[in-house]
A protein has these predicted regions:
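Structural signature of alpha-helical solenoid repeat scaffolds
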Residues: 29-33, 77-84, 133, 165-169, ...
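Short inter-helical turns and helix N-cap capping residues of alpha-solenoid HEAT/ARM repeat scaffolds
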Residues: 16-17, 67-68, 120-121, 152-153, ...
């Protein structure tokens, strides 16, 4: 993954051919998730590419033009992964995330997520929620509950339970900023009930296991919060 290969992929995202768009979005998505400082990724060059305001806005323009829900989900995943891996990751300089290019990228990602949080597609709402939660906004809990009423596949539930467990870890560690911010008691009850419903309705052992572990962790987190 280099600046040059990403430039080509970004240009070809404007293709009317959905197969071509899927190929290019997958390439950019893999770059956003690739091993940092690994053999296949020129990390600092790719970081600069993603954080360039020109590339960011081009990516957002093609995102707005996209009509395929799975590709929209992938665009939103890219925004989240850039925030996690190319801005906030612990391997960069201490105040790197405070640089204007980083602040602007996260602000735009948050704006886009808010915009797509009520999209007709449940998977698009889920990934919008994941970004909103990453930014510490507790609107994520209502979004996740809404999604679990409509969509209970392995990928969707794995992203939702990951977010909930990140929240639990952040609370337990006493972090200043953590996934989903403050969870109200009503939101906690709704999330637990939604997870129990998914558990009851699913015949998939992996989904059932994720739900059980997350329910247990969230129930334990409530006790920790009450003691504090």
């Amino acid at each position: 993954y280099t600046k040059e290969t990403l430039d080509v992929a970004l240009e070809e995202l404007q293709s009317e051919n959905v197969v071509q768009r899927k190929k290019c979005i997958n390439f950019i998505s893999m770059a956003s998730r690739s091993e940092l400082f690994g053999k296949t990724c020129d990390t600092l060059s790719v970081q600069t590419w993603f954080l360039s305001s020109e590339n960011r806005e081009k990516l957002i323009r093609v995102l707005h033009q996209e009509t395929e829900e799975k590709l929209l989900w992938e665009y939103l995943l890219i925004l989240l992964m850039v925030c996690e891996r190319y801005i906030d990751h612990g391997c960069y300089a201490k105040d790197f995330a405070k640089e204007s290019s980083c602040v602007e990228f996260k602000q735009r990602a948050y704006e886009i997520a808010k915009q797509y949080a009520h999209h007709s597609s449940a998977i698009v709402r889920q990934m919008s929620g994941s970004i909103i939660g990453y930014m510490g906004d507790n609107d994520v809990w209502d979004i996740f509950c809404n999604v679990m009423l409509k969509k209970r596949d392995l990928l969707t539930i794995s992203h939702i339970t990951l977010g909930i467990r990140r929240h639990c870890t952040g609370v337990a560690n006493g972090d200043n900023h953590f996934f989903g911010g403050t969870m109200t008691n009503n939101q906690r009850i709704d999330i637990l009930n939604s997870l129990r419903l998914v558990y009851q309705k699913s015949s998939n052992k992996s989904i059932k296991g994720m739900c059980l572990r997350t329910i247990e962790e969230l129930e334990n987190t409530k006790e920790v919060a009450n003691k504090a």
